[in-house]
């Protein structure tokens, strides 16, 4: 696009855009790069560049600008290192600055990664920020950014500078004695000055021998001699010697640092290039923010669809945004109408925004605006204010048009201002039509302006061609600068004359002098203008309604999300509270069981039903915890019924049926289960129908304890269960069997790996309610089952 750019950059004022871009860059190399930024015709390259601008804009919005400060171009220093030359302090200080900035930006990038901010389009630059630690450490110890060598560069330099400071103090003390004591009468002024790096006194000429020493200089009149007193001569000599040693040590340090830097030329260059590129891209994002620009949506279909596009160089408070289209339902747009209405600015806006996008810059248009990537952009744009053009201007205009016609292709954009102007109107109009017909055959995208009325019908007679015009406010007698696509320019001469007070009869006569065809065209344009305005107003109203609906939907969704989050938080809090309560109750139940077991081991008499009752309470707590975990609280609440004395109920913690015999409290009852009376809460019982408790039992057994069970079975099958699950079920089963009065039960555990079988045997061995146990006979399962006798 070099040829295209060299011709249109000045006309479209693209150079003013990149000057603004350069001003927003921080480093000198990035500023220079910005001034060289040219649009690209490679779609992939443009998209990549736009992506980078988007990433930096997002970073600027979320985290702020990158920590980059100005540094000088390191390439001259690297060239010197390449030929083994030594660098001075300023050059090494600049390299140290580059490495320090690389470290800072690297940390900045790490923070972006932690915040999960996308940096993929600039990843290669971030990866190049690799600082050689040994070089950085040495430079940090030895040199300042401005090139000053630090005291810490070497122990020798530190000692030398200490000695220099101490010796200088001694010199000043001696000299101060001269200018404040009895010797002041011999001095022209009571000051200490320096000549040739040595401290001297301004002595009157006639007293030059009073101080001894050496005369270093004299005043212009010869009345004052600058004398180095004999008393400080030795100190000054020592000072000069120390300073010479300091210079020598600094020289040695710079040589050492240069040699170390020479080993990392590639790394230094990579860091500098990465910082330059990141600064350059950051400038793009800053320009977008400054202009309130948005990311263009690129397409490969040569479609332009700009919404509320505004010229980026016109005051935002004054510029009028316009919708501009090409390549949708038409490829050629003719903007007709009088001069000074904004036709040229519209062309320039289209061309400049297209150039900006192809340079990877954001555009001054509404979000979602579409642009494409053209191979070339041809433009012939003159001065909008020039109504009459000279023959030489017409020749220049035609010369440009001919070049465009000879080179344009379907992949190009053509912008022509006042096509065919500068010659006889009739010939100019005919020439414009012929040129347009020729250009349209190339299938390029074309936008032209003209004030020839003959072209008004062109858009209606040619395929994929449309008219457009700049709106004019008849009440204010001023252009509105709004583009009206689909409507040709309307002549407003009669309306303006009437508004200004011209005799109505004169205006009417002028209308009568117009031929019927022209009159009909103007009436048609007037109707189209009114219809378009009405349609646009309706569209704007509908758009506002849609935007409000989208906003409301977003607010409602946010509210719903917040509500769901609050509900979830409350559920989690309730779960935590319930877990704490259940853990507390579990400890209480375990303490009861442990106390009972302790009493038994101590020889006390503990009733079996007390132990079982305590275990039942523990089982109840475990089941409540499971219900909470599975979120089945509401299901249990639905099943619960109001109960009262005399109701037949099922006690959930025991899995047994009984009858409520007494109400102990608001939520507490006494239930008779066989001969056993237990205390329960209303949450632990379910009311059952009277007939349910009188069903024929699966197995009815009366024990010596007199307890009858309608639910207990003489067998328990543990096959297929996990180890812990099997032992838990075994414990509960034996409790229920004891309550049911069963004397003998069979535990089916299978053979398998023997884990459950061994676990069962170990459990039975410890349980004091087990009288004896043995494997079942061969015909009843053998070692796959155990017969247990209870006591």
Curated annotation (Swiss-Prot):
ATP binds at residues 337-344. SUPFAM superfamilies: DNA repair protein MutS, domain III, P-loop containing nucleoside triphosphate hydrolases, SMR domain-like. Endonuclease that is involved in the suppression of homologous recombination and thus may have a key role in the control of bacterial genetic diversity. Residues 703-713 have a biased composition (Low complexity). It comes from the Bacteria. CDD domains: ABC_MutS2. This is Endonuclease MutS2. InterPro entries: DNA_mismatch_repair_MutS_C (IPR000432), DNA_mismatch_repair_MutS_core (IPR007696), DNA_mismatch_repair_MutS_sf (IPR036187), MSSS (IPR046893), MutS (IPR045076), MutS2 (IPR005747), P-loop_NTPase (IPR027417), Smr_dom (IPR002625). GO terms for biological process: mismatch repair; negative regulation of DNA recombination; rescue of stalled ribosome. It comes from Lactobacillus gasseri (strain ATCC 33323 / DSM 20243 / BCRC 14619 / CIP 102991 / JCM 1131 / KCTC 3163 / NCIMB 11718 / NCTC 13722 / AM63). GO terms for molecular function: ATP binding; ATP hydrolysis activity; ATP-dependent DNA damage sensor activity; endonuclease activity; mismatched DNA binding; ribosomal large subunit binding; rRNA binding. Homodimer. Binds to stalled ribosomes, contacting rRNA.
